[in-house]
Amino acid sequence: MTKSELIAQLAARFPQLVAKDADYAVKMILDAMSDALARGDRIEIRGFGSFALNYRPPRVGRNPKSGEKVHVPEKYVPHFKAGKELRERVDIVE
């Protein structure tokens, strides 16, 4: 599902919500989550999952084209861990 599909689905599910308002709401939620992660905060949505930053230490990598060694600096990467309820909901065994 893309962001525009999410907005369309919200507007269809809630007739009192104009598509423009759904777009604004989704944008504000995603901005708030991005800002929280940029500050180093953890985001927990009960029943859905949590977002946090994982630290990746500096390392020596290789340029795949030339085989030359390159220094890859340390960085933080966003990480999502699904909550128990979400894992159970998507674990459909037929």
Curated annotation (Swiss-Prot):
Keywords: DNA recombination, DNA-binding, Transcription, Transcription regulation, Translation regulation. It holds the Pfam family Bac_DNA_binding. The keyword Transcription applies. One of its GO terms (cellular component) is chromosome. GO terms for biological process: DNA recombination; regulation of DNA-templated transcription; regulation of translation. One of its GO terms (molecular function) is DNA binding. HAMAP family: IHF_beta (MF_00381). Belongs to the bacterial histone-like protein family. This protein is one of the two subunits of integration host factor, a specific DNA-binding protein that functions in genetic recombination as well as in transcriptional and translational control. Heterodimer of an alpha and a beta chain. This is Integration host factor subunit beta. It comes from Azoarcus sp. (strain BH72). The gene is ihfB.
